[in-house]
Regions:
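Thiol-/selenol-based redox modules, centered on thioredoxin-like
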Residues: 169-201
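N-terminal "domain-start" segment that seeds a small globular fold
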Residues: 34-84
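Hydrophobic membrane-insertion alpha-helices, especially the h-region
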Residues: 10-29
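Short active-site neighborhood of thiol/selenol oxidoreductases, capturing the structured segment around
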Residues: 76-115, 122
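Structural microenvironment flanking redox-active thiols in thiol-disulfide oxidoreductases
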Residues: 105-142
Length: 201
């Protein structure tokens, strides 16, 4: 019997190590599963938000902006909207507010910079509601904005009630079309949308 004690000890140590390894694997699996569930929940919420925004996008289609709408640039210069739209007939507009989701705005600026070349940026304007020219300059320098960046009050478009950043096309006759409400959780959909819009500019 005494000779069996080392075997029992080794077996006990082996069982402890096995249980420890199993517990570690199960814990890691649970953490990974929980993260996946959280990610899926976030994406589901984003798509639910997109579905909620869709009626506002549709009701904004065809909305005509006033060509005399006053825009203010980072130097404090004021210009009517008709003077800043693309001479090529269509302008891609990115509109956001100070009250919008900051991570969304950061992601959108990075996305615009990564997929728009110099030619495409000439057909882009960014509209926000920073009424202080200094804040506009900080924004321009922070995100290295090379396209038109302007401050403007509410445009009166239904989609503004959603309180989320959005993109749309502005035609030369001031008609709005192709609205898309963008969320940071759906960056791939936003990129696909922007690439499709670029073909129309």
């Amino acid at each position: 019997m005494p000779k069996q004690k080392p075997h029992i000890l080794l077996l006990s140590v082996g069982l402890v190590l096995l249980f420890g390894f199993t517990a570690c694997v199960m814990a890691k699996t649970y953490i990974a599963y929980s993260k996946q569930l959280n990610r899926m929940a976030v994406i589901q919420t984003a798509f639910e938000n997109m579905a909620f925004c869709r009626p506002y996008e549709l009701s904004s289609e065809g909305f005509c902006l006033s060509p005399t709408t006053v825009l203010t640039d980072a130097e404090g210069k004021k210009s009517p909207l008709s003077e800043v739209v693309s001479a090529h007939g269509r302008t891609l507009v990115y509109r956001f507010s100070r009250m919008n989701c900051l991570p969304c705005i950061v992601m959108h600026f990075k996305l615009l910079k990564s997929i728009l070349d110099d030619r495409a940026q000439m057909g882009l304007i960014i509209l926000c509601d920073y009424h202080n020219a200094r804040d506009l300059r900080i924004l321009r320098n922070t995100y290295e904005v090379s396209c038109g960046l302007y401050s403007v009050d509410r445009l009166g478009i239904p989609i503004e009630d959603v309180n989320n950043p959005y993109f749309f096309i502005l035609t030369q006759d001031m008609r709005c079309e192709g609205f898309f409400t963008a969320f940071k959780e759906t960056s791939q959909q936003t990129e696909n949308f922007l690439r499709a819009l670029l073909e129309k500019l």
